[in-house]
């Protein structure tokens, strides 16, 4: 199953591979846990007695908490509809710091491409999609019948003679997938997961303010350098100093996901991401690397019998 929240840049396709390249330990920190894919893989792996997640994004931490720790906060059977206005009102409340769990659900489940910024449905199909959602999830049979009739009338009204058959077919294909409900189903499946008792807590701290002394392994997934995908400036030089000092000053083994970094590369992963489009979708593939704040020999010793001599990591030394 897919791990983590519906999240742009999610590592759900490679999370378990990443965890397999990390050494076992007592307590591990996922310092930039984002949508929680690696965090959940860590908890499920049973390689650690305790797992802690951290991220600066308040909506992310609130939703992870609702799905993984303090469960029962999200309505799955009859989820509230999320119109375009609802979506942007939720974003505003999150920005103001005065939000509830439904605002977090709206942000992550009703955004296009999981970007948390753009409303999921285009203006051309929004009315159809919302009617289709509600004919499946409205609380009463009477309400579901009402939205079924609305959906049916919308489809029939759109069946005018000036529309070509191919255009109509493409339009109907776009209506088949109710992405928001699919993402809610994903959250519900995650909430039902067991074996997450090793997930100790979630925090919301700047990575430069964390007291790392309680951890013997730390994993970072910082903004990738040169990608220009973020609305804030990240101090890479300061981070590199922190990453290095965890080993030299505290003897903490730290790992970093990046495309390129000035540290020991211990593994590579091929990540495929599905990119949403107006009709259909496309795939992009990238090579992500895992870096270590020690030497190659130290990494081999850390992994012990778990070091995979046959894996691609061997050629990186």
Locate the predicted segments by residue.
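Short, solvent-exposed loop/turn segments at secondary-structure junctions
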Residues: 12, 35-38, 57-60, 69, ...
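S-adenosyl-L-methionine
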Residues: 1-32, 37-44
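Long, positively charged, glycine-interspersed low-complexity recognition regions
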Residues: 225, 231-317
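Hydrophobic "anchor" residues on beta-strands that sit immediately upstream
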Residues: 26, 51, 217, 253
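Class I S-adenosyl-L-methionine-dependent methyltransferase module
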Residues: 45, 49-201, 316
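Active-site flanking residues adjacent to catalytic metal/cofactor-binding acidic residues
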Residues: 29, 54, 220
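Active-site segment flanking the S-adenosylmethionine/decSAM binding pocket
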Residues: 203-236
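Mobile active-site "lid"/loop adjacent to the S-adenosyl-L-methionine
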Residues: 119-121, 126-130, 226-238
């Amino acid at each position: 199953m897919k791990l983590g929240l519906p999240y742009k840049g999610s590592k759900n396709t490679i999370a378990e591979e990443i965890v397999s390249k990390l050494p076992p330990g007592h307590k591990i920190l996922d310092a930039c846990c984002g949508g929680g894919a690696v965090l959940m893989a860590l908890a499920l792996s049973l390689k650690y007695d305790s797992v802690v997640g951290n991220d600066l994004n308040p909506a992310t931490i609130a939703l992870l908490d609702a799905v993984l720790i303090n469960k029962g906060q999200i309505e799955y059977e009859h989820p509230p509809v999320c119109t375009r206005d609802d979506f942007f009102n939720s974003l505003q409340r999150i920005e103001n710091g005065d939000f509830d769990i439904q605002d977090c659900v709206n942000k992550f489940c009703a955004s296009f491409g999981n970007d948390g910024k753009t409303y999921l449905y285009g203006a051309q199909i929004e009315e159809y999609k919302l009617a289709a959602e509600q004919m499946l999830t409205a609380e009463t049979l009477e309400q579901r019948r009402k939205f079924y009739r609305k959906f049916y009338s919308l489809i029939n009204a759109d069946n005018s003679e000036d529309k070509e058959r191919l255009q109509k077919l493409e339009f109907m294909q776009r209506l088949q997938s109710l992405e928001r409900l699919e993402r809610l189903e994903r959250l519900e499946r995650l909430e039902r997961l067991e074996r997450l008792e090793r997930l100790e807590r979630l925090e919301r701290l700047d990575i430069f303010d964390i007291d790392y002394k309680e951890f013997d392994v730390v994993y970072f997934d910082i903004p990738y350098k040169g990608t220009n995908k973020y609305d804030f400036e990240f101090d890479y030089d300061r981070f590199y100093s922190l990453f290095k000092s965890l080993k030299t000053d505290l003897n903490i083994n730290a790992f970093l996901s990046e495309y390129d970094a000035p540290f020991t590369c211990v593994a590579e992963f091929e990540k495929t991401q599905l990119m949403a489009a107006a009709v259909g979708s496309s795939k992009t593939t990238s090579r992500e690397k895992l870096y270590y704040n020690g030497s190659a020999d130290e990494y081999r010793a850390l992994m012990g019998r778990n070091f995979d001599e046959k894996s691609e990591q061997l050629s990186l030394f």
